[in-house]
Amino acid sequence: MITTLADIEKGLRRQEADRRLSRVRRKLLVMSGKGGVGKTTVCVNLAVAKARAGARVGILDVDFHGPDVAGALFLEARVEADGAGMLLPVPAGENLWVLTVQHLLEDPDEAVLWRGPRKMRAVERFVTEAAWPELDFLFVDSPPGTGDESLAAFRQVPGLEAILVTTGHSLSLADAAKAASFLRAARAPLAGVVDCMGTLVCPRCGEETALYPAGAAEAFAARSGAPLLARLPWDLEAQRLSEARGKPVVEAAPDSLLAGRLRELADRL
Ligand SMILES: Nc1ncnc2c1ncn2[C@@H]1O[C@H](COP(=O)(O)OP(=O)(O)O)[C@@H](O)[C@H]1O
Ligand SMILES: [Mg+2]
């Protein structure tokens, strides 16, 4: 086989990415079996909490069909490339950088129609052909399930661990079990489970009420051989403040039960 200049350049970019990634303290992919369980909310708020605490943090969004990181950060921007064609992650306030396909689209409502190989290649480009600054933490937001995007992320990011988000509902737990099985097959470590929206904070009195059978998420975590890292309440008021103030919950409603639990979770990482 003939080695081309392009092959050599690709190899050098790979080496540089591996060198850069080896210095990142923790690389965490937020995943789930089911959709709509709170992945993007967890991912973005953990990243913001860490960045506000002084760490240098990157968010890589590999959810190409539902890229919500930009929306969850209330960050409109366009990704630029430098002279060498390297993508420049978008700054999102002090210590935080974001790379998402949403910031590459001409029309914000445009659908990304990529299939398997195109998505695998895009993840590779976001990792090896992007000028990421030196980071302490990298959070990867993923689509639900066990598809190409998450697999590509584990291939492209050495040392990547998973945080598995689920609700306490039986269907969410059943799909989470498949995600855990995927991780075992991919030999990817599971850092822990997050139970999201398993309790409800009463908007009137602030009392926290369980929505699902007690211990369901905890038992799932134990079966998966990973710790239950957090129980995040369904907090409608914190969510409302986030929307109204145009900031993630940890910034928009720092005194809420949800923000407190998210900060505790960030501290455990
Ligand atoms: N703990 C929570 N309290 C209130 N709303 C939440 C909470 N977690 C997620 N949400 C809301 O639920 C919806 C789905 O969450 P999202 O993070 O987008 O899930 P996913 O990324 O898994 O699809 C969003 O509208 C989000 O704002
Ligand atoms: Mg999402």
Question: PLM features: what roles do these ranges have?
Answer:
Residues 1-12, 180-269:
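C-terminal lobe/tail of nucleotide-utilizing enzymes
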Residues 1-37, 78:
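Extreme N-terminal, non-catalytic leader segments
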Residues 24, 35, 61, 69, ...:
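Residue-level signature of catalytic and energy-coupling elements of molecular machines
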Residues 26-64, 176, 180-182:
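Walker A/P-loop phosphate-binding motif and the immediately C-terminal alpha-helix
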Residues 56-61, 164, 192-193:
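Short beta-strand "acidic-cap" motif of Rossmann-like dinucleotide-binding folds
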Residues 56-58, 62-105, 120, 124-127:
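Phosphate-binding loop that captures ATP/GTP phosphates
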Residues 105-158:
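Phosphate-binding/switch loop-helix module in NTP-utilizing enzymes
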Residues 140-183:
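Conserved P-loop NTPase nucleotide-binding/switch module
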